[in-house]
Curated annotation (Swiss-Prot):
GO process annotations (BP): translation
Name this protein carries in UniProt: Small ribosomal subunit protein uS12
3-methylthioaspartic acid, modified sites: D89
Subunit: Part of the 30S ribosomal subunit. Contacts proteins S8 and S17. May interact with IF1 in the 30S initiation complex.
Organism field: Hydrogenobaculum sp. (strain Y04AAS1)
Chain residue ranges for the region called Disordered: 106-135
Record's compositionally biased regions (Basic residues): 111-123
SUPFAM superfamilies assigned to the protein according to its UniProt record, in alphabetical order: Nucleic acid-binding proteins (SSF50249)
One Pfam family hit: Ribosom_S12_S23
Keywords carried by this UniProt record: Methylation, Ribonucleoprotein, Ribosomal protein, RNA-binding, rRNA-binding, tRNA-binding
Stored InterPro entries: NA-bd_OB-fold, Ribosomal_uS12, Ribosomal_uS12_bac
Listed Low complexity bias regions: 124-135
GO molecular function: rRNA binding; structural constituent of ribosome; tRNA binding
């Protein structure tokens, strides 16, 4: 433990917060171009084919991004908007693609949590038909 004189002379060292999404360089989102779109298998207790894309960001950094939601229209050379946020069961995937922005289409027929998947609000008649005409 330092003495009062040592603290006056040196001061305490600030703990630097390490960024969880360093490729974004402090920005909330970054634009990028898909270099490769493919699937990967998750870590041990889970089993699936998760859709991911290798994206070259506008700052030149290349990152692996998760494509959320069911189905997507992405292919090589698609322009995408990338945000931070890791996928727990995919090692090395620390970014997500924003659905409904730039070349990425929103999720079709999405009824709940629509804003997270870039889905437009369904028409009133269509919503009634899918629910089975409840009054």
């Amino acid at each position: 433990m330092p003495t009062v004189n040592q603290l006056i002379k040196e001061g305490r060292e600030k703990i630097k917060k390490k960024s969880k999404a360093p490729a974004l360089q402090g920005n909330p989102q970054k634009r990028g171009v898909c270099v490769r779109v493919y699937t990967v298998t998750p870590k041990k207790p889970n089993s699936a084919l998760r859709k991911v894309a290798r994206v070259r960001l506008s700052n030149g950094i290349e990152v692996t991004c998760y494509i959320p939601g069911e189905g997507h229209n992405l292919q090589e050379h698609s322009i995408v908007l990338v945000r931070g946020g890791r996928v727990k069961d995919l090692p090395g995937v620390r970014y997500k693609i924003i659905r409904g922005a730039l070349d990425t289409a929103g999720v079709a027929n999405r009824r709940q949590s629509r804003s997270k998947y870039g889905a437009k609000r369904p028409k009133a008649g269509a919503a009634q038909a899918t629910k089975g005409g409840k009054k």
